[in-house]
Amino acid sequence: MNRISDLTRRLWAALLALCLVLALTLPVFAEGESETADTAEKETFHIGTVDDLLQLADSCRLDSWSKNRTVYLDADLELTGSGFAGIPSFSGVFEGQGHTISGLSLVDDGSVIGFFRYVQQGANVRDLVIRGRSMPTGSRSTVGGIAGSNAGTLHNCRFEGVSSGASVVGGIAGTNLAAGVIESCTTTGSVYGAHFIGGIAGE
């Protein structure tokens, strides 16, 4: 009888220990899931309004901000009167999702001008349509409708409008660097320049 009682006590003790382990483990799992969700939220950025796009452009003044981040364009946008001056530097993934951004007007003094000024190596810009004009004043070098300088991948993008500069002017990109890839992209409109101009890339 004592042996049965000892066995029962041991079983209850083991069961209690198991319950304590589970009670301590579950909050850890919950915390891990929460951290994963927070990380996923930080790694994506959705653009549904012009203000969202302006916020993206401001954030991308820091070269590293867009790295490992995916940006989704969720709606067509009209930029007329918005003051949008281009996205300074982009290193992530931009999913245009077939949407159109109209009213682009890049007419300030400068060089390396485009909807994206610099598309960095490893970046991807896909399924995006831009309508407007990329016509800076001043030195006016390295001008494109989608990118001023491209070292990433531009896929299935279209520019409809005018690209104009003094040199290195393209409908899609002003300059396509050695690491840059431009595929399935088209231009409808005009490209003006004195040296190194092209319908897709100036050089």
Regions found by a protein language model. Give the residues of each.
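Bacterial N-terminal signal peptides that target proteins for export
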Residues: 2-15
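Bacterial N-terminal signal peptides
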Residues: 14-27
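Surface-exposed repetitive/solenoidal architectures
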Residues: 29-203
